[in-house]
Curated annotation (Swiss-Prot):
EC number(s) on file: 3.6.1.-
Entry protein name: Uncharacterized Nudix hydrolase NudL
Cofactor: Mn(2+); Mg(2+)
Cross-referenced Pfam families: NUDIX
Motif position, Nudix box: 67-89
SUPFAM superfamilies: Nudix
């Protein structure tokens, strides 16, 4: 697939036809969810945030809107939508959820479910000052280009853990966020 010419209809068709199999074991029992907001344009965008430098965990990192599943959340999808509204003012009613990717185990002990949703291009994003320092859009075709991600093996407590690194403009995209973007690319058939 030529990444420079990805159109929204092509992305949607590939995502629906190549639906992921979600049956994997996890060591983490605490649930979290992130929203992968795809901006509805002929050539779609990917909405990302940069976390506030004042946060205790993952300060300053590029991330998807998301967080822990609360007792009030009916599902991981509801949690992702709630967090997106809290962090960047995306109303849940504005998100067309098209599916989920297989959960990812975080280094902080959560099983994180990525929820893929389509959002309108004209939403007035408003970053929560406590949690988000920037909201930006990256062309989806660029985000899904696997050649932009570089592996780094980290050794922690005797175990090797691979993370992926990339840059977009002034933003350093790495860790779980880069890994989820790569999984989305592989899900729709992008070849390494």
């Amino acid at each position: 697939m030529e990444y420079r010419s990805l159109m929204l209809d092509d992305f949607l068709s590939r995502f629906q036809l190549l639906r992921p199999q979600i049956n994997r074991e996890t060591l983490n029992h605490r649930q979290a969810a992130v929203l992968i907001p795809i901006v509805r344009r002929p050539q779609p965008g990917l909405l990302l945030t940069q976390r506030s430098i004042h946060l205790r965990k993952h300060a300053g990192q590029v991330a998807f809107p998301g967080g822990a599943v609360d007792d009030t959340d009916a599902s991981v999808i509801a949690a992702a939508l709630r967090e997106a509204e809290e962090e960047v003012a995306i109303p849940p009613s504005a998100v067309e959820v098209i599916g989920v990717l297989p959960p990812v185990d975080s280094v902080t002990g959560y099983q994180v479910t990525p929820v893929v949703g389509i959002i309108p291009p004209d939403l007035p994003y408003r970053a929560s000052e406590d949690e988000v320092s920037a909201v930006f859009e990256m062309p989806l075709a660029q985000a899904l280009h696997l050649g932009r991600y570089h592996p780094l093996d980290i050794y922690r407590r005797g175990d090797s853990h691979r993370v992926w690194l990339s840059w977009y403009e002034q933003y350093f995209v790495w860790g779980m966020t880069a890994g989820i973007i790569r999984e989305l690319a592989l899900q729709i058939g992008v070849k390494p």
